[in-house]
Amino acid sequence: MKEFDKLYLSWRKGKGSRRHIVGVLEHTPNGSFVFTYDNSSVEKAATEGFAPYTEFPDVLKSYNGQVLEIFGQRIIKSARPDVQQFYEFWEIDPAFKEDKFYMLAHTQGLLPTDNFEFLADYNPIIGLHFLTELAGLTNYKLPPDAIKTGDVLRFEIDKENEFDPEAVKVFNSDKEIGYIKKIHCRLFHKPGTELLKLTVKAIDKNGIINKIFIKVSM
C-alpha cells in the first residue's frame, strides 16, 4: 500500500474560515498526474471569493501534462540558505526531497501569498509520519500555557458534528483544543487508527495560541 496517491487542493477565504476542497491532484496507475476541480465545492467557494488556480482557469476541464511541475513551483527552492531548517521542521525524508508529489504532501505547498494548500489522503502504514496544523483554533482562544511542545495528544471521532461527518477532535488530556484538518482526518477513520500517535511539534502564540503543528505517526 502506498502512503498516498491523491492530494486534495484546499482553499479558504482566510484564517478562521472553512476550508473548501476545490480539486484533486491524482497520481494515476500509468504514472501520470491529473488535476481535476470539484465543481460543487468550487461553486460554494466562489460565494466567498474563490478564483481558479491561475494556470488552470477552466474548472470543467481535467488537466494533465505539466500539472505537477506547475504545482511544484510552490515548493521551497533547494538553493535557499534556510532550506535545511525547512526540511528538518517538516521532517522530510532526504530520499524524497526531489519528489514534488511527496514534497507537496508533506509541506502542504503552503505559501504566504495565497490560501491554497495540498492535503494528502494518507493510508495507515507502519512508519507513516507527517505534520498537520490543528484546525478551529480561532474558536478556542487557547491561553499560551494550554499546551507545550512535546505534549502527547489524543483524538476522538466527532460523531455529532453536523457540518463534517469525518470530523476528528483533538484533546490535551481532557481539554479539547482543536480538530484535525479536512482530508487528513480521513486517516483516523481507517483500520489501524489505534496505532496513531499525536505529538505537538511547534506552537505559534502571541497572547493566545495562533497555530499548533502536530506530528501524526504510527
Which functions belong to the PLM regions below?
Residues 1-218:
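Conserved active-site motif detector
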